Amino acid sequence: MAKKSMIVKAAREPKFKVRGYTRCQICGRPHSVIRDFGICRVCFRKMANEGLIPGVRKSSW
């Protein structure tokens, strides 16, 4: 779980546009965020396994 202070800091508009970064909407994790869904890989995997993301299924070949 991300620190509350960092989540609040990331929510503010940065002074320069390039300083902005994505955070997971669920847990606040700053790394490995899947932009299409707005969540990190950990939350994505958990939600996909629970069937909460429509159209996503585990691949097998």
Swiss-Prot record:
Give the record's GO biological process terms.
Answer: translation
Give an example GO cellular component term for this record: cytoplasm
Q: Which domain of life is it from?
A: Bacteria
Q: How is the cofactor bound?
A: Binds 1 zinc ion per subunit.
Q: Which cofactors does the annotated protein need, by name?
A: Zn(2+)
Alphabetically sorted, this entry's keywords are: Metal-binding, Ribonucleoprotein, Ribosomal protein, RNA-binding, rRNA-binding, Zinc
Give the binding site residues for Zn(2+): C24, C27, C40, C43
Any single GO molecular-function term of the entry would be: rRNA binding
What the entry lists under HAMAP family is as follows: Ribosomal_uS14_2_B
- Function noted in UniProt: Binds 16S rRNA, required for the assembly of 30S particles and may also be responsible for determining the conformation of the 16S rRNA at the A site.
The similarity comment for this entry is: Belongs to the universal ribosomal protein uS14 family. Zinc-binding uS14 subfamily.
Describe the protein's quaternary organization and the partners it interacts with: Part of the 30S ribosomal subunit. Contacts proteins S3 and S10.
Q: What is this protein called?
A: Small ribosomal subunit protein uS14
> Which species?
Sulfurimonas denitrificans (strain ATCC 33889 / DSM 1251)
Tell me the name of the encoding gene. rpsZ
